From Swiss-Prot:
Organism: Emericella nidulans (strain FGSC A4 / ATCC 38163 / CBS 112.46 / NRRL 194 / M139)
Protein name per UniProt: Lipoyl synthase, mitochondrial
GO molecular function: 4 iron, 4 sulfur cluster binding; lipoate synthase activity; metal ion binding
Cofactor note: Binds 2 [4Fe-4S] clusters per subunit. One cluster is coordinated with 3 cysteines and an exchangeable S-adenosyl-L-methionine.
Keyword Transmembrane helix: no
Phylogenetic lineage: Eukaryota, Fungi, Dikarya, Ascomycota, Pezizomycotina
């Protein structure tokens, strides 16, 4: 036992490391605990062995604590061009950082997670229905789907599947030359879902189906007819494609019983070849809107343009003049937001005051209604209450409300 104890003591004493004494050479390179006083005369030598970081360098070169408390060295407010300038940030690990565009605070929206959102999503999945809200990654989905009850919610049903035959540079909907065949039960299922929700106003849209002889126009029309059979008082807006310029098919949809015929020109004429699929042209879209109005003059016709793609003021003026020339009633303006890195980049973030300016200009040109704001989309609910009111007054024969009575904040919500 004594021998074992002696061996243990020998091993213990040989493994001990002497603690450096203050003033010795070894003490200068000794790394102490976090409580070691860094203000000693040897502090400069001890920091020399520590790894400096970029963050530390930036912090040391930045404003002092006094500047932070006082609000900074320059308290002058930013002008709008500075406040809403296109900003970027480097994201990712060192050596592989990528420059990404940062959204202004007024373009950020909450992640959808309300009970009504989940309930509405479950209903759609149960009936095998798709919405453009999800497929196009609309930023307003939490607002439109998150109402307190289903009657207050707005969902834009996307017909004819979730795969488009075209590939516009701004759109995140899936594309294929040969998408799946149409679901013959979709018109009935769509009508059932809409009648179940008890909505007063519904928006239907679709992918482009250039693989079909009629572009899917008869499928679209059948859906509208079945909705009107199940819910005669519901107001139906249809946001359609251009049917490859086949105006006869435009008439089929326009005479199916819908109340609002919408077709988006998306951007100004000069940018159309760079933004939309090569099979879509600005003039073809104008002919679609004109044909819908001629097929049923009582229809409200509607279109939408994205801003922030690099358009000029004169190009926007020209687009609005051409739209009024074919008697388009409603126009909406919204900010283009890049859905993924594969899509075309944002040229600029347009300020809210510019959206308001174009709203007023559109109304002054004679448009019945204009919804204009960074988060406004063609089927956003901001305009539906007004359009619904106009349609009901037309049915009853009452005079329509002048567009000058529309509150400014309603169009930019």
């Amino acid at each position: 036992m004594a021998a074992a104890t002696n061996r243990f003591r020998a091993l213990y004493s040989s493994s001990r490391v002497a603690t450096p004494q203050a003033g010795s050479a070894s003490y200068l390179s000794y790394r102490g605990y976090a409580t070691t006083d860094p203000s000693s005369a040897t502090g400069g030598a001890s920091t020399a062995g520590k790894r400096r970081t970029t963050f530390t360098d930036k912090l040391n070169a930045g404003p002092s604590f006094g500047d932070f408390v006082s609000g900074g060295r320059d308290n002058a407010p930013l002008d709008p061009s500075e406040a809403y300038a296109l900003k970027t940030a480097l994201v990712g690990p060192a050596g592989r950082k990528k420059e990404m565009t940062r959204l202004p605070s007024w373009l950020k929206t909450p992640i959808p997670d309300s009970k009504n959102y989940q309930r509405l999503k479950k209903d759609l999945r149960g009936l095998n229905l798709h919405t453009v809200c999800e497929e196009a990654r609309c930023p307003n989905i939490s607002d439109c789907w998150g109402g307190g009850d289903k009657a207050a919610a707005t969902a834009t049903i996307m017909l004819m599947g979730d795969t488009c035959t075209r590939g516009c540079r701004f759109c995140s909907v899936k594309t294929s030359r040969a998408p799946p065949p149409l679901d013959p039960h979709e018109p009935e299922n769509t009508a059932e879902a809409i009648s179940r929700w008890g909505l007063g106003y519904v928006v239907l849209t679709s992918v482009d189906r250039d693989d079909l002889a009629d572009g899917g126009a008869r499928h679209f029309a059948e859906t509208v007819i079945k909705i009107k059979q199940k819910a005669p008082n519901i107001l139906v807006e249809c946001l359609t494609g251009d049917y490859a310029g086949d105006l006869e098919m435009v008439g089929v949809v326009a005479r199916s019983g819908l109340d609002v015929y919408a077709h988006n020109v998306e951007t100004v004429e000069a940018l159309t070849p760079h933004v939309r699929d090569r099979r879509a042209t600005f003039q073809q879209s104008l002919r679609v809107l004109e044909a819908a109005k001629k097929a049923k003059p009582s229809l409200i016709t509607k279109t939408s343009l994205m801003l922030g793609l690099g358009e000029t003021e004169e190009q926007l003026w020209d687009a609005l003049r051409q739209l009024r020339a074919v008697n388009v009633d409603v126009v909406t303006f919204g900010q283009y937001m890049r859905p993924t890195k594969r899509h075309m980049a944002v040229h600029e973030y347009v300020t809210p005051d510019r959206f308001e300016l174009w709203r007023q200009r559109a109304l002054d040109m004679g448009f019945l209604y204009c919804a204009s704001g960074p988060l406004v989309r063609s089927s956003y609910k901001a305009g539906e209450a007004f359009i619904e009111n106009v349609l009901k007054k037309r049915r009853s024969g009452a005079p329509e409300v002048s567009h000058n009575t529309v509150p400014v904040d309603e169009a930019t919500r």
